[in-house]
Amino acid sequence: MAQGLTLAGVPLEFLFFALVLGTIAAKPALAGRAAAAGALGISLYKLACSPFDEGAGWHGLLAHAGHEWVGLVNLLALLLGFALLARHFENSRASHALRHALGEGPATGFILLLGVFVLASFLDNIAAAMIGGAIARSVFRGRVHVGYLAAIVAASNAGGSGSVIGDTTTTMMWLAGVPPAAVFTAYVAAASALLVVALPASLQQHRYSPAVRGPVEHHPVDWGSVAVVGFVLCLAIAANLLVNLEFAGWAGVFPFLGLSVWLALLLATPLRRPEWLALPGALRSAAFLLSLVWCASLMPVQALPPASWPVTLAAGFVSAVFDNIPLTALALKQGGYDWGYLAYAVGFGGSLLWFGSSAGVALADMFPEARSARAWLTQGWHVGVAYVAGFFVMLAVLGWSA
């Protein structure tokens, strides 16, 4: 099959994608338009000058879309559904009750991050991050430090990295025959990284806007909204387990997880009506992330370097700007990896930038001040340190076992 154009040996697709990412990092206000323009521009370029993995021209484009649609629709449904779920949680006033339970001082921020980590181990990391963000908004009186927002995303991605139901990439490994125990070892790195992130982030947040119990709320918890949140989460977990345990062959055929979230929201409407006004903002964020995922899927990556721990470490940094699903698919096809390391790298690595993971994009929709690559990198400096530290702790404790 003919190859596309190159510049100094680099396929033009990569240069176009780098231009998109550079624009997003430099001009956050243009992020949505830059991502959409990149998705359209790279698609047109591949139609005219460079074949898709599935073939050239319109046939290749349609075949590629057929290959990607389940993941894209699932992601869209989850981002929109969990945006409505987060509003249910905020409207329940449960976060106000938690504000009194969590207490005061720097330990409050640490405990909340630990809770997000645990929640993400059995729940989608998007939901874990958004629930964590909703609690943080209440506990810290609406003033949440960007460094702490980065820590919430890191905690959610770390929590899902060692669980075969906690992240799409780990589920992919499970479906490909990787034993859950091999993925579970990622928690050695993830737990270490959580400690490195949580300590400075909690102190950052305490200096910026400390947690206070405040006056006793006169409005009781809306248990109807709490019931809706619990129902949606339980149905999502049940659907995820059922599909992957009993109908694994269908997991890549239809967006069952996203559908289950929306089915639960609609079934619960008689009890509590969703706050539909939250959808336009969530849709803009979803369109941004879907455009980036589509761009990443168009990159002509046919193979990864031979598996080793330095390559796996580098994959984590790459996953901050490149969709981790095709990275994981390539690694599974190639083989030779220690899967615990890969699960940690492609999971936690997405926390390095606000647009590096779906959890980050979802949280940035709740807190627009997070949409700054400079602020994320400078104020969330501990995320990068934690990623490297966690990786080398795991290497020292377990060694590399391919």
Language-model segment annotations:
Residues Q3-G9, P28, G57-L75, P179-A189, ...:
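Interfacial loop-to-helix junctions that mark the boundaries of transmembrane helices
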Residues A8-E13, G71-L75, A101-L114, F140-A150, ...:
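Membrane-interfacial loop-to-helix junctions in multi-pass transporters
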Residues V10-L21, P28-A56, L72-L84, S225-L235, ...:
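Hydrophobic mid-bilayer segments of alpha-helices in multi-pass membrane transport proteins
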Residues A26, G32, L85, N91, ...:
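Juxtamembrane and boundary regions of transmembrane helices in multi-pass small-molecule transporters
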Residues P28-A31, L85-R93, L119-I131, G159-D167, ...:
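Short helix-coil transition sites and intra-membrane helix breaks within transmembrane domains
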Residues A107-S161, M172-A176, A329-Y344, G399-W400:
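Hydrophobic transmembrane alpha-helices that form the pore/transport pathway of multi-pass ion
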Residues L194-W262:
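Long, contiguous bundles of hydrophobic transmembrane helices that form the permeation core
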Residues F231-Y337:
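Transmembrane helical segments that form the transport core of multi-pass membrane transport proteins
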